[in-house]
Amino acid sequence: TATCAGQDKPCQKHCDCCGPKGECVCEGPCICRQG
């Protein structure tokens, strides 16, 4: 799982992409993917 910038908790199991606001993204374009 990834922990996006500004987030205290890791993303959900299948939501490991980070969006432009640091939110977890499950589908669609991803700005970054962090381990």
Curated annotation (Swiss-Prot):
GO terms for cellular component: extracellular region. Disulfide bonds join C4-C18, C11-C24, C17-C32, C26-C30. The lineage of its organism: Eukaryota, Metazoa, Ecdysozoa, Arthropoda, Chelicerata. GO terms for molecular function: sodium channel regulator activity; toxin activity. The keyword NAD does not apply. Blocks voltage-gated sodium channels (Nav). Expressed by the venom gland. This is U5-ctenitoxin-Co1a. The keyword Iron-sulfur does not apply. It comes from Ctenus ornatus (Brazilian spider). InterPro entries: CNTX. Keywords: Disulfide bond, Ion channel impairing toxin, Knottin, Neurotoxin, Secreted, Toxin, Voltage-gated sodium channel impairing toxin. It is found in: Secreted. Belongs to the neurotoxin 03 (Tx2) family. 06 subfamily. The presence of a 'disulfide through disulfide knot' structurally defines this protein as a knottin.
